[in-house]
From Swiss-Prot:
One of its GO terms (biological process) is protein unfolding. The gene is hslU. Gene3D superfamilies: 1.10.8.60, DNA helicase RuvA subunit, C-terminal domain, P-loop containing nucleotide triphosphate hydrolases. It comes from Nitrosomonas europaea (strain ATCC 19718 / CIP 103999 / KCTC 2705 / NBRC 14298). It is found in: Cytoplasm. This is ATP-dependent protease ATPase subunit HslU. InterPro entries: AAA+_ATPase (IPR003593), ATP-dep_Clp_protease_ClpX (IPR050052), ATPase_AAA_core (IPR003959), Clp_ATPase_C (IPR019489), HslU (IPR004491), P-loop_NTPase (IPR027417).
Length: 443
C-alpha cells in the first residue's frame, strides 16, 4: 500500500498527465484516505468506508491515464474494467461478481511476484548449487570420511568461479525439473466462471509435482532453476490469506465507460439490460460478500472509481441508487492548444521524446523547433474543434502523419539530422488540416 502524501501523488501524476488538477487532487485524497483509515483504531475503522469517485469528461483528456498511473502508485490490488463487458444476471455475458474475482487474482499475482523478487538472491544461490551438483556429482558417502575432501571442495570452487564469470554458459547439463503444466480451456455457460476456474485448478493440481530429466545449456538451466526455486520458497497459503485481506482493505476498482450502461428515457429495448447491470453493481459498490475460490470477499472497503464521457447521457441518467454511491464527482476539462503543447514536450515520456528515441535506433537525429511544436498543437486543437474531439489521442495521428516519410525511409536517412520546423509541419499537414473532409478521414 502507498504511503505517499496527496502532494506527492499529484506530483507523480503531473509527470505524465497535463492539467486536470481537480481529478488528480480527488484521487490523491482517496488514495491517502486508504492509509489514514489503517491508522484509526477499531471499531471506528470498520465504519469508515471509502468515498467513491465519478470522473466526467470527454474522451482523450486523461481519465484512463489517471487510472493507469494510479495503479502503479497505489501498490495495492487494482483492476481496470470496462462497464460494457458486463450483462445482467441471466443474459449472455459476464456478471459483475467476476470483477471481484479478477481483482483477487490480480492481488495474488502481484503478491507472488513481490515474494519471488524478495526471494530472488536465495533462489539464485540454490540454482547455482543444483547446477554445480549436475557438473560435479557429489561422491557417495562410504562412511570413511566425515566430510568431503579438500580437493573436491577446491574443484567445486573453481567451477563456481567459472560459472559466475559465464565461462560455462554454453555447456550442456542434464537436470531434473518440474514438468510444465498443460493449460486446459473449458467453455462454460455465462455465470459459471467460478465453477470453470475450480475445474481448471483441479486438473492443474493433478499434474503438479511431476518431474522429468532435461538436457539444457547452463544459461537456460540457470534461469529455469532460479524460477523453480523462487516459486518453491513462496508459502502459497500465507500468500493467499494476505492477498484476500489486502483486497478487502486496500482494493481499488476502476470502472471505465460507465456512461455506456446508462438508460435514457427516449431509448428503449436494451435499456432493460443496462439498468440490470446498474442494479447488479449496486450491492458490489455498497458492500456485499462475493464467493471466490480463495474464500469469501467483503467489498465494504473497496474503492470504486468510475469514469465516462457522458456525451449522449448525463450522470443523472444513472439510477438514483447508483448515483448516491459515487458522492465525489470530478469534471475533467477539454484540452486547449497550450495543453497539447505541454503534452508534446513536458511529460516524462512525451511524444516528441518517444519519436526521437525510436528514430535514434536507426541513427537519425530529430530536432523540433519551438514554432513547430506550437504549430502541431494548433493543428491538433483545430482538427478536434472542427471534427470529432478525441482529445490528446489526436496528437498520435498528427505525429504519425508528420513523420511518415522519415519513418518509412529511415534506413536511407541513417546518420542524418532532421530539423522539424513550422514550415515542414505546414508542408506535411497544412492542406490536410485546412480541409475538413480530409482532416475527418486522415487526421
Amino acid at each position: 500500500m502507498s504511503y505517499m502524501t496527496p502532494q506527492e501523488i499529484v506530483h507523480e501524476l503531473d509527470k505524465h498527465i497535463i492539467g486536470q488538477d481537480t481529478a488528480k487532487r480527488a484521487v490523491a485524497i482517496a488514495l491517502r484516505n486508504r492509509w489514514r483509515r489503517q491508522q484509526v483504531d477499531e471499531p471506528l475503522r470498520h465504519e469508515i468506508t471509502p468515498k467513491n469517485i465519478l470522473m466526467i469528461g470527454p474522451t482523450g483528456v486523461g481519465k484512463t491515464e489517471i487510472a493507469r498511473r494510479l495503479a502503479r502508485l497505489a501498490n495495492a490490488p487494482f483492476i481496470k474494467i470496462e462497464a460494457t463487458k458486463f450483462t445482467e444476471v441471466g443474459y449472455v455475458g459476464r456478471d459483475v461478481d467476476s470483477i471481484i474475482r479478477d481483482l483477487v487474482e490480480s492481488a495474488i499475482k502481484q503478491a507472488r511476484e513481490r515474494e519471488i523478487r524478495k526471494n530472488q538472491p536465495l533462489a539464485e544461490d540454490r540454482a547455482e548449487e543444483r547446477i554445480l551438483d549436475a557438473l560435479l556429482p557429489p561422491a557417495r558417502d562410504l562412511g570413511f570420511e566425515a566430510s568431503p575432501s579438500e580437493e573436491s571442495n577446491a574443484t567445486r570452487q573453481k567451477f563456481r568461479k567459472k560459472l559466475r564469470e559465464g565461462e560455462l554458459d554454453d555447456k550442456e547439463i542434464e537436470i531434473e525439473v518440474a514438468m510444465a503444466q498443460t493449460s486446459m480451456e473449458i467453455f462454460a455457460p455465462p455465470g459459471m466462471e467460478e465453477l470453470t476456474s475450480q475445474i481448471q485448478g483441479m486438473f492443474q493440481n493433478m499434474g503438479s509435482g511431476k518431474r522429468k530429466m532435461r538436457k539444457l545449456r547452463i544459461r537456460e538451466a540457470r534461469k529455469l532453476l532460479t524460477e523453480e526455486e523462487a516459486a518453491r520458497l513462496v508459502n502459497d497459503e500465507e500468500l493467499k490469506l494476505g492477498a484476500v485481506q489486502n483486497v478487502e482493505q486496500n482494493g481499488i476498482v476502476f470502472l471505465d465507460e460507465i456512461d455506456k450502461i446508462t438508460s435514457r428515457s427516449e431509448v428503449s429495448g436494451s435499456d432493460v439490460s443496462r439498468q440490470g447491470v446498474q442494479r447488479d453493481l449496486l450491492p458490489l459498490v455498497e458492500g456485499t460478500t462475493i464467493s471466490t475460490k480463495y474464500g469469501m470477499i467483503r467489498t465494504d472497503h473497496i474503492l470504486f472509481i468510475a469514469s465516462g464521457a457522458f456525451h449522449l447521457a448525463k450522470p443523472s441518467d444513472l439510477i438514483p441508487e447508483l448515483q448516491g454511491r459515487f458522492p465525489i464527482r470530478v469534471e475533467l476539462e477539454s484540452l486547449s492548444a497550450e495543453d497539447f503543447k505541454q503534452i508534446l514536450t513536458n511529460t516524462d515520456a512525451c511524444l516528441i521524446r518517444q519519436y526521437q528515441a525510436l528514430l535514434k535506433t536507426e541513427g537519425i537525429e530529430l530536432n523540433f523547433s519551438e514554432d513547430a511544436i506550437g504549430r502541431l498543437a494548433e493543428i491538433a486543437f483545430s482538427v478536434n474543434e472542427r471534427t470529432e474531439n478525441i482529445g490528446a489521442r489526436r496528437l498520435h495521428t498528427v505525429m504519425e502523419k508528420l513523420l511518415e516519410d522519415i519513418s518509412f525511409n529511415a534506413t536511407r536517412y541513417g546518420g542524418s539530422t532532421h530539423v522539424i520546423d513550422a514550415v515542414y509541419v505546414d508542408e506535411r499537414l497544412g492542406k490536410l488540416s485546412q480541409s475538413e473532409d480530409l482532416a475527418r478521414y486522415v487526421l
